[in-house]
Structures are given as C-alpha cells and as structure tokens.
From Swiss-Prot:
The entry's keywords: Cytoplasm, NAD, Oxidoreductase, Pyridoxine biosynthesis
Binding site for NAD(+): Q127, V128, D147, T176, D233, G258
Enzyme Commission code(s) on record: 1.1.1.290
Aminoacyl-tRNA synthetase found in the keyword field: no
Encoding gene, per UniProt annotation: pdxB
Source organism of the structure: Vibrio parahaemolyticus serotype O3:K6 (strain RIMD 2210633)
Protein name as catalogued: Erythronate-4-phosphate dehydrogenase
Pathway(s) this gene product operates in, as recorded in its UniProt entry: Cofactor biosynthesis; pyridoxine 5'-phosphate biosynthesis; pyridoxine 5'-phosphate from D-erythrose 4-phosphate: step 2/5
Length: 377
C-alpha cells in the first residue's frame, strides 16, 4: 500500500508508516504523475484536489485533508470516482482563535485601548468562530456574531445582520470558508464598498481565506492612513503577496494561524483514525500522546489577574509579532511563503499551560480562554 503524505504534516510519517509505504511530498507541487499507483492521499490546504490532479490516480481510494477547511477539494468529483474523502473539522479552531486574540492583545497595547471596552464582531460562526465567541464571552468581552447559514438552520444563538455587525464592531474578525456561489457567497465579502465604509478606529482581522477580502480594495483603504488597522494571515493570491499591501498591514503572516502544534497533531490523528476505520484496522492515535511537554508548563499567579497579566501570559505562549517579523524579513525570497509554513516553529496552545493560584486569583475566565487551571490552598 502506497500513501502520499504532505511533508508538512507532523507525526504523519510515523503514524501512516504503520499502514503502508509513506511517500512524503510538498503539497503545493503535487502532479497527476505523482498519484500513479497511489492508494491514499493525505494533504493540507495547499493541495488542490481536482480533475487534473487525480487524472492518473489509477488506485486512489482515500483522500484525507488534515485541515478544517475543505474548499481545496472537489468533493463531488471524489464521490463520483468512488474515492472516500475525510477532513479534520475543528482541528485548528483553537490555534486560529488564539491567533486572533494575540492580534487583539498586541494592538490593544500598541494603540492604548482595553479589549474589555471593545465590541468584537465575528463573521462566520462555524468551529473557529464559535470557539472564539466562547472564549471572548467567557472573558466578559462583548461579542456579535454573523452566520446566515447557522441562523437559517435554526441555531438558537443571537445573530446580527452583516451590515449592523460591521457598523457596531470595533474589531471585525473573519472566520468563513470561501465560496463564490449560493445564497451567501463569501468571495470578496469584504469588498471596496464595505472597506470604504469602515471607520478609522476599526480593526479587521482575516484568518479565514484570502479572497474573503478584496486585497486591492484593502490596499486602497489602508492608503488613506486614517487609523484603520488590518491584520492578514491569508492573502488573496497566496503564496503570492502584494508587496505594496504588506507595509500597510499591522500584522502579516503566511497562513499559519491554525498551525499550532496541537492543531496539526489533531488534524493528523483525525485523518489517520479515519483511514484506519476505512481499512477496518483497529489502530487508533490520540493527539495528546504525541505532544511534548510545553516549554513553560506551569505559571504561578499570586494575585487576581488584570489586563497587563493577561497580556503577559498570552504573549509568552504566542505573540503574533514573532511570526510577523519573520514574514517581513523573509517574504521577498523565492518560495518563502511555503518555506515558512514548512519550517514553522512548535507553537503551543494555551491549554499546554497550567495556571496555578488561590481563589482570589479569579482563574475561571482564564479557563474559558483555554488555560488549564489549578486552585492552590
């Protein structure tokens, strides 16, 4: 049995080698010839699974993407060909939410505001958006959500119409898939009209898909230099990056918001377990068994936390400025976008750290944010 695995998928080689011969490949440059005599294909979001790619896939029976997003896969085509498909919904929701929170925290420091005084508008209330909503509300931050699909499906949460959310939110963060068709397409959801209507004190974060925001219109909006702030983890034509847009952004990173070690381990184990089920194999893997101990597994609090403490403990685990600085330094080099993804550091989630303090430390909201907590006597 031959299994192609994206070379950027952690723990995949050791897991899938239990099932057959593993062939590691760079996901963005896979060709139809690569899939000749291949039984299974394990990918990430950079691999476009379409008619061209599988045109010579004479043995392919299983495709798994270790990502929550699935818009890079022609699922109807795979179904037509009798090829089983699976994804890893929710695997990276924590990492993406913590990326967005880091952007908020750092901008709060830089611009001199409190996140607790702001309204955060979340567009897209799927796995990521819903998790971010839970975290922010658990911290006592005012949140608005928009998701017409969830609303129409009878989701009991209170949804805000898009135009109202955009007008009422101080921070707008995007967590939608990319779609061009249907009742609620998201391609250029944030277009020239929306961007020109944004106030100078508003912040836009895109950690969803690049084309959700019209990057040319965003560049023109940022050129007004009226205080409007934008942070992008995804770009409309990535891996190509508009080098005129880059200096206008508060933060820019190479599609790594969901690249935390826990999220990648979850994605790998989810599709490994699905493939084992497909093969009627009893092997199973658990992400927690693969992860190393965090560099700083425990932090002690000696008093009730305040916003400064929150800044310190969250940034100790993940500070978006680290990725932003590397991106600006390296992006002009050939192939840099994918190299930064390939060589991404072992970023951890808040859950890798236990906060220890007594009852006066008010640890419960920090648990809502994702930290493990331990109340000392």
């Amino acid at each position: 049995m031959k299994i192609i695995v994206d070379e950027n998928m952690p723990y995949a080689e050791e897991l899938f080698s239990q099932l057959g011969e593993v062939i590691l490949k760079p996901g963005r440059t896979l060709t139809a010839d690569d899939l000749i005599d291949i039984d299974a294909l394990m990918i990430r979001s950079v691999t476009k699974v379409n008619a061209e790619l599988i045109s010579k896939a004479n043995k392919l029976k299983f495709v798994g993407t270790a990502t929550a997003g699935m818009d890079h896969v022609d699922q109807a085509l795979l179904k037509e060909k009798g090829i089983f498909f699976t994804a890893a919904p929710g695997c990276n929701k924590v990492g993406v939410a913590e990326y967005a929170f880091s952007v908020m925290m750092v901008l709060a420091q830089q611009q001199g505001f409190s996140v607790f005084d702001k309204t955060v508008g979340i567009i897209g209330a799927g796995q990521v958006g819903s998790y971010l909503e839970k975290c922010l509300k658990g911290m006592g931050i005012n949140v608005l959500i928009n998701d017409p699909f969830k609303q129409e499906a009878g989701d009991p949460r209170s949804f805000t119409p898009l135009a109202e959310l955009i007008e009422q939110s101080d921070i707008i963060t995007l967590h939608t898939p990319i779609t061009k068709d249907g009742l609620h397409p998201t391609h250029h959801l944030i277009d020239e009209k929306v961007l020109n209507g944004l106030r100078g004190d508003q912040i836009l974060i895109n950690a969803a898909r690049g084309p959700v925001v019209d990057n040319q219109a965003l560049k023109q909006r940022l050129m007004k230099q009226d205080g409007f702030t934008a942070a992008l983890d995804v770009f409309e034509f990535e891996p190509e990056v508009d080098m005129e847009l880059l200096p206008l952004l508060a933060f820019a990173t190479p599609h790594v918001a969901g690249y935390g070690l826990e999220g990648k381990a979850r994605g790998t184990t989810m599709i490994f377990n699905s493939y084992c089920e497909f093969l009627n194999n009893e092997l199973r893997a658990h992400a927690s068994d693969l992860l190393p101990t965090a560099p700083v597994p425990t932090m002690m609090l000696d008093r009730a936390w305040d916003e400064a403490t929150l800044h310190n403990i969250t940034q100790l685990i993940y500070d978006v400025r680290k990725d932003d600085a590397l991106f600006r330094r390296e992006i002009s080099k050939p192939g840099a976008f994918d190299l930064m993804r390939k060589n991404y550091w072992d970023r951890r989630e808040y859950s890798a750290v236990t906060l220890v303090g007594n009852e006066t430390c008010n640890l419960a909201p920090l648990a809502e944010l994702g930290f493990q907590i331990e109340v000392s006597q």
